[in-house]
């Protein structure tokens, strides 16, 4: 009979977007409890060791973290399995580098470097808007933040721009047709486009129709859609490829053109 939380994760059961090889051991680092779900997060040890190659093993990652050199969303994190997730800003003090965790078109977290100005804020998708004790209104974002006294115009599925230094909302973007979005789940994960149409299904999943910069149309569930800007203007910089998924033939042609 299981008592308490699970503490281990077999390597083969780890999320595929962590891109761990099968033969380097039996176990994988298991994300701690935190702002993102295990299967939607990237532990700091994998980011520093496997992605950036700043450490050779877990012991070296711990040595880096214990010097309090790594910040996630402006807060020092010393837990090597802290779950960083979508839209989180990771800052490395010694190298002066800033990264934002966003998906590439293959559904993996891209190593996306950003400027100091962009590292000062993050976007949060509004999951819930409610009235709490003593009639105080509040909203909850996708990364577990509770923000009190929000603008009454902010509704569920809208996106808020959060200043990381104060934790306050500086602006927000409505979930509306014509706004630019990124897909955060499903087979179209990581693709970027503008909303063209929303199908409402009572008792089922609402479907959102999206058109990318090359006029390719695709659809996904409403829960997978994250608004990242108003109109065509994104509030964040996008990783290489700008969220445009090419077909296999288009990828081949692009490779050939590069070789020539």
Curated annotation (Swiss-Prot):
- Keywords, alphabetical: Ribonucleoprotein, Ribosomal protein, RNA-binding, rRNA-binding
Residues in S4 RNA-binding domain copies: 42-105
UniProt cross-references to CDD domains, sorted A to Z = KOW_RPS4 (cd06087), S4 (cd00165)
Molecular function in Gene Ontology: RNA binding; rRNA binding; structural constituent of ribosome
Any one biological process term the GO annotation gives: translation
Q: InterPro entries, per this entry?
A: KOW, Rib_uL2_dom2, Ribosomal_eS4, Ribosomal_eS4_C, Ribosomal_eS4_central_region, Ribosomal_eS4_central_sf, Ribosomal_eS4_KOW, Ribosomal_eS4_N
Instruction: Spell out the Pfam families in the cross-references.
Output: 40S_S4_C, KOW, Ribosomal_S4e, RS4NT, S4
- State the source organism's domain of life: Eukaryota
An example GO CC term for this entry is: cytosolic small ribosomal subunit
Which family is it part of?
A: Belongs to the eukaryotic ribosomal protein eS4 family.
Instruction: Kindly provide the name given to this protein in its UniProt entry.
Output: Small ribosomal subunit protein eS4
């Amino acid at each position: 009979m299981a008592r308490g939380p699970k503490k281990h994760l077999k390597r083969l059961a780890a999320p595929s977007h962590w891109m761990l090889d099968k033969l380097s051991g039996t176990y994988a680092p298991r994300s701690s409890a935190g702002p993102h779900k295990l299967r939607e997060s990237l532990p700091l040890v994998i980011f520093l060791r496997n992605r950036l190659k700043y450490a050779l093993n877990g012991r070296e990652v711990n040595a880096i973290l214990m010097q309090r050199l790594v910040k996630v969303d402006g807060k020092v994190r010393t837990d090597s399995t802290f779950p960083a997730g979508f839209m989180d800003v990771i800052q490395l003090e010694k190298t002066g580098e800033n990264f934002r965790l966003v998906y590439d078109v293959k559904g993996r977290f891209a190593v996306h470097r950003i400027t100091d100005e962009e590292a000062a804020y993050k976007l949060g998708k509004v999951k819930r808007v409610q009235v709490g004790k003593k009639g105080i209104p509040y909203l909850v974002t996708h990364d577990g933040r509770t923000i009190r006294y929000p603008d009454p115009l902010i509704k569920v599925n809208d996106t808020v721009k959060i200043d990381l230094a104060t934790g306050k909302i500086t602006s927000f973007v409505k979930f509306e047709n014509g706004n630019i979005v990124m897909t955060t789940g499903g087979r179209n994960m990581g693709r970027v486009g503008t909303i063209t149409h929303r199908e409402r299904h009572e008792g089922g999943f609402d479907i959102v129709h999206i058109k990318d910069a090359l006029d390719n149309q695709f659809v996904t569930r409403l829960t997978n859609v994250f608004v990242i800007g108003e109109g065509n203007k994104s509030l964040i910089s996008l990783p290489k490829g700008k969220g445009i998924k090419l077909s296999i033939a288009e990828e081949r042609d692009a490779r050939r053109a590069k070789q020539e």
